[in-house]
């Protein structure tokens, strides 16, 4: 069964408040989303495997630990998920980056795929899917299904804010995928937006309407 982890660190909550504020401009919004993604990465990677190695410090030889598990691929759901990639890459610079393009049909609210480019060894990697908002859950569930179709086995989803409805959709569709969020918000409104949410993350990241 999938696990939902809410990462309620004071720095994350402070920055999330600034992200939510409608008066925060695109430049600050981009920087804040990147910073929160980087902070969340500490918890997202908490269960990564380690191995012991021998090194030599300026003082003596000693044993220490390094990452030993699978290599990582970050897969943003376009376009808003792009805003979280650089923050995670700062901590895992060797990670590969795939892209999945989905947009939401404004009438049906269902996701439509328009782009998919993934590392060839996607099945051997730990996959971190990024999307600032988990609203209806349709895009995330479809993106994860597409990853599995391409061979991915080890997937975790990272979002800034999530609606309970979206969490349930992803958990029901993919009980093997853990979800990490900075905030679980109240609900979805009639238009499928998260309340209180942060508006349209893609538009706010890139200054579009």
Swiss-Prot record:
InterPro entries with a match to the protein in the record: PRibTrfase_dom, PRTase-like, Upp_B, UPRTase/APRTase, Ura_phspho_trans
Pathway: Pyrimidine metabolism; UMP biosynthesis via salvage pathway; UMP from uracil: step 1/1
Record keywords, A-Z: Allosteric enzyme, Glycosyltransferase, GTP-binding, Magnesium, Nucleotide-binding, Transferase
Regulation (activators, inhibitors): Allosterically activated by GTP.
Reactions catalysed, as given in the entry: UMP + diphosphate = 5-phospho-alpha-D-ribose 1-diphosphate + uracil
Binding-site residues for 5-phospho-alpha-D-ribose 1-diphosphate, renumbered to this chain: 79, 104, 131-139, 200
SUPFAM superfamilies, sorted: PRTase-like
UniProt-listed GO biological process terms: UMP salvage; uracil salvage
Cofactor(s) the protein needs: Mg(2+)
Domain of life assignment: Bacteria
Known role: Catalyzes the conversion of uracil and 5-phospho-alpha-D-ribose 1-diphosphate (PRPP) to UMP and diphosphate.
Protein name as annotated: Uracil phosphoribosyltransferase
Origin species: Clostridium tetani (strain Massachusetts / E88)
């Amino acid at each position: 069964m999938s696990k939902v982890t809410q990462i309620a660190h004071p720095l994350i909550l402070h920055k999330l408040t600034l992200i939510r504020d409608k008066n925060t401009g695109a430049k600050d919004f981009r920087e804040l989303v990147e910073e929160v993604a980087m902070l969340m990465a500490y918890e997202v990677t908490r269960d990564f495997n380690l191995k012991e190695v021998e090194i030599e410090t300026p003082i003596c030889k000693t044993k220490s630990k390094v990452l030993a598990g699978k290599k990582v691929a970050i897969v943003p759901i376009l376009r808003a998920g792009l805003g979280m990639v650089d923050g995670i890459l700062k901590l895992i610079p060797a990670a590969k980056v795939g892209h999945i393009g989905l947009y939401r049909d404004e009438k049906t609210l269902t996701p439509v795929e328009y782009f998919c480019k993934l590392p060839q060894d996607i099945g051997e990697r730990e996959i971190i899917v990024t999307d600032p908002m988990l609203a209806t859950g349709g895009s995330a569930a479809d993106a994860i299904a597409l990853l599995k179709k391409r061979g991915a086995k080890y997937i975790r989803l990272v979002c800034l804010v999530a609606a309970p409805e979206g969490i349930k959709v992803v958990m029901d569709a993919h009980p093997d995928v853990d979800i990490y969020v900075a905030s679980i918000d109240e609900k979805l409104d009639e238009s499928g937006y998260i309340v209180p949410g942060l508006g349209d993350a893609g538009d706010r990241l890139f200054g579009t309407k």
